[in-house]
Regions:
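Secondary-structure boundary/capping motif
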Residues: 21, 43-45, 70, 80
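Phosphoinositide-dependent membrane-docking surfaces
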Residues: 23, 38-59
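Acidic, Ser/Thr- and proline-rich intrinsically disordered linker/docking segments
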Residues: 50-149
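A structural detector for beta-sheet-dominated domains
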Residues: 7-8, 16-19, 26-27, 47, ...
Length: 149
């Protein structure tokens, strides 16, 4: 069983490590960030995590489309971090390993779009899968709370 995975790189990526029980988000994106001394990596211990919500992003362009899976990590002190999980170099097997590792982490995971249950069963490529998820999400429509008045 795989216990850790680096999605992306140590310049821009996300390490999920069940051995050390931590998530590290590497964000060494630009010289500007280094100069202004913004944090270049974010370390979150599993013990500090209240829950993780699995989200997606889809951008439809004129020349090509792009898709992304992100984790919205909510800590015990109610700080929220959006951490990208998929990058340009991400392969299908990497996404499957990410799902397996995060499921085995014993963290509270909220997966409102059923990405973890549907992706391992699909034959679609990643972008088409996210388009499918997006279509299903909007097909259901928006549910607004009822008001009295």
């Amino acid at each position: 069983m795989i216990e850790y995975i680096l999605m992306g790189t140590k310049k821009h990526g996300c390490l999920i490590d069940n051995r050390k029980k931590e998530i590290i988000y590497y964000q060494l994106l630009s010289l500007y960030e280094k100069i202004v001394k913004e944090p270049q990596q974010l370390l979150i211990k599993y013990s500090d995590i209240k829950k993780i919500k699995i989200c997606y992003g889809l951008t439809t362009g004129a020349r090509f489309d792009s898709a992304q899976i992100t984790m919205e990590v909510l800590t015990n002190n109610n700080t929220s971090y959006d951490i990208p999980v998929t990058y340009n170099s991400t392969k299908n097997k990497d996404i499957l390993s990410f799902i397996e590792i995060l499921k085995s982490s014993n963290l509270l995971i909220e997966d409102p779009y059923n990405i973890f249950s549907l992706y391992p069963e699909t034959n679609l490529d990643f972008i088409d899968f996210i388009k499918f998820i997006n279509k299903e999400h909007y097909k259901k429509g928006f549910e607004y709370p009822q008001t009295t008045g």
